[in-house]
Amino acid sequence: MSPAEALASLVVEPGYRIDLVAAEPLVQSPVAIAFDERGRMYVAENRGYPDPLEGGPAAAPQGVIALVTDTDGDGHYDRRSDFATGLTYPNGVMAWDGGVFVTVAPDLLYLKDTNGDGVADQRRVVLTGFNTNRTAQIRFSHPTLGPDGWIYMTAGLNGGRVTSPAHPERRPVEFTSSDSRFNPRTGEFELVGGQGQFGLTFDDQGRRFICANRNPVWHVVLEPPQLKRNPNLAFSETVQEVSAAGAQAKVWPISRDLTTASFIPTMMNAPHVGTFTAASGVHIHRGDALPDGQRGSVFIAESAQNLVQRQLLESDGVSFRSRPARDGVEFLASRDTWFRPVFLANGPDGALYIVDMYRKDIDHPAYVPEPSRRLFDFTAGSSRGRIYRIAASGRAPVRSPVDFAAASVEVLVATLEQPNGWRRDTAQRLLIERNAQAAAGQLRSLSAAGNEFGRLHALWTMDALDVLRDDDIVRAMRDRIASVRENGVRLAERRLPQSPQLFDALIPLANDTDARVRLHVALALGAVDDPRNIDVLATIARRDGADRWLRAAVLSSVRNRASAFLDAFVAGPGAAPAVRGAVMQDLGRLFGAAESAEQCLAIVTHISAPVAELSWQPAALAGLAAGLRTRGIASNAQSALMTLVSADTVQARVARERLATLMVRAGQLALRQGAPAEQRLSAIELLGQGEWSASGNTLVRLLEPQREAVIQIAAVRAIGQLRETQAAASLVEPARWQAYTPQVRDAVLTVVLSEERLVSVLLDAVASRGISASALGASRWRRLTAHRNPAIRQRAEALYNAEETGTAMQVYQRKLPDVLAHTGDPARGAAPFTRYCVACHTFNGTGGVVGPDLSGIRNQPADALLLHIVFPDYEITPGYEAYTVQIGDGRTIVGRLESEAPNSVTLRDGTGQSHAIVRTDIKSMTAATSSLMPAGLDQTMSSGELADLIAYLKSAAR
């Protein structure tokens, strides 16, 4: 479409207006933008995208950094210069000190125009060594100035061996996939939490968010150095999944575009259409030109489905949750399948800017099966591109020129209070670039008396300028605004070892009303190895121990004082049972990993002492067992915990006797329906550290379909921990397997395939037909047929080949040439679809819901579609297996498992009717080994009719 036609095809949420501010030929293949202090826009143009199919560098680097300007102030850019050319795949740009940083792997470049002609005459490699061994869309990107004056970048799911040409004396930083940051003034480079793909943003309070293709919003909660203080802490997570992800991350496109997954035969039962498959450019809007109340909204671009989603961000403990602002309809969507939003930004005018790469296809050819590549033109649109501006409708756009280049220090400091986030960030950047230490007095006044924005920016600017004083931080930690206290604690962390004043001011904040403040107090205490920390950390743990982030922060800061922490934790006011159990489990893991055998035996004896009611004890022992496992003391016949208590000493004998008694009680707790779920789960985990002879019967009972799925899955994992062969065999016993729901089956397969000693048990079950070969799915068969153990590999190959040459496969292979020889007619194919398929399957919005929606398979090769018609059991979509449930009133219900809850399951029968069944009413539940789709449908149709049906299913394809 022309730029005007493309603009007309956009549908934006009511209350907003959208304007086209730049289009080809002014911009081409834009993927990122940045505004400098004069309001000029730098555009990273990735014209050479995608890289060659065979990998390696592009034949001729085509990337450009364009400098575009609005010369007449009408809000539309009208002049361009090629600021820098000959770049491979530039994918990020950020203004700094009169020039720009550009991410163009393997290098981070600095480009600057020193003579004012609009062309960079200075080009310097700041950092180098970022990997280029993966496709162009999986490389480091998004240079973004953080509140601390460092520039943050996403990993692009990639790594490198990064060095600084200006500082050859510095050691290389090697990593496989981690986000990073560098100091633009010193060139220091270090890794940070998160593994973002193509998207990085900060909120007004300085918190960092990233994204990946199937993960629209992640919040970076912790940083790796904060977790390294305690080497025995088994916690490595740094990000919280804020939004729904994967198949749950819904989008509502108005176009009919394709996703790469639609072309992969092994994914035909799990199409990505209707879910985020290319989330990028995650952006928290901090401008003032959107409708009132929209500050802090999260925007995510979805280029594969031609839309931008707006989500609402809500606090969730120390982190956040988000949800689509409108269910069923997007913030911005286009009917034009070439609309490819990839990057979002705050503008100088407070508006939201959207970068549209505008391509026919946006993907890498290596991700598309070879037979389907001919349907794509990966370079079509490389000379096009559009940039849009969105603001509140009915509000006059800001037209005042922006030029902070000559602004005085006084003006810049005053700007730190403005509601426009871009202006605040730019003012802070300029103060840092100028090393404006003379502004310390003004900044100090602002940090004490400004609004929230001003206080936060002033604090971090003083820190970057090295003029921040301890009393500034103390004042911030006592501020009435929670976010100011939070940032005050963050600033205090690295100063604590040298500042008793800060330490004393920090202690009362252990009882702060804000969870994020308490989180950072716990983290800050880890910066100083002081025994006084322990009581404070115990206070936080008793209040917040159920939160995994706060628990990890506390235990990281405990360092090597686990015994002292245990004493302080149990000596204080009683914590809630759930809190006590969670803390004691992780604390037990620390003891098991680090303490001597004698100390661990003493803990087993103490915890296993007789009590009236079990609550936290199983959790603590399960944690201890997990810690012991890391020491490699388990034998082929015994778990690490049982090995510990089997020593030939009086201490071990006492511990063993007490543990045996507690194990019996743990089994009773696990079976008790009304007991708290977390206590039952801990008890089940502990049973998995015992012996099959003592725990097996209880764990098998927990696999019954009457039990909640979460209980069944916990039992599966526990059985997988037991060392005896009969334990694993119990998981794949045919009658039991048939009763499992898909969720439980998946857990069984995951557990059995996780240990080499258990794989043979699974292969035995497949060989005896107790488990259908198709139940494993293609990906698991690929793992087995590539197994490192030759015996397993050869046996798996034999079983898989037997399945591939069975009767149904022979029928398929016989029919395939004849069907493909016909030219199918989509119009004629509607009749067999209506006759045989529509009752169970939806296609293009019409049909039943018993089977999978077929709308997403229209791009599959004809041979793959024929395979599923002739051989419906070849691959059964998880969730569409047939189940037979006998219930207490004598009825038998057959259908697919539509959903399951802790206390019930719902089946949808062949007529489309749903049946909700309380688990306690289930007498038996059995899964069929075959698909709900009847075999032999191909026998009712001629080869020509099959070709017509396939053509109909593919009728919406390009």
Language model features by range: what are they?
Residues 280-281, 351, 385-386, 461, ...:
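C-type cytochrome heme c attachment motif
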Residues 21, 41, 98-100, 105-106, ...:
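C-terminal capping alpha-helices of c-type cytochrome domains
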Residues 747-749, 753, 767-794, 848-855, ...:
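Axial heme c-ligation environment in periplasmic c-type cytochrome domains
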Residues 119, 159-164, 186-188, 317-318, ...:
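Inter-heme linker and motif-flanking segments adjacent to c-type heme-binding CXXCH motifs
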Residues 154, 192, 203, 211, ...:
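Generic beta-strand/beta-sheet core signal
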Residues 130, 286, 312, 391, ...:
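Sec/Tat-exported extracytoplasmic proteins
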Residues 1-411, 422, 430-433, 502-503, ...:
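Beta-propeller domains with acidic blade repeats across secreted/periplasmic ectodomains
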Residues 377-383, 390-832, 850, 857, ...:
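Long, ordered, helix-rich scaffold segments
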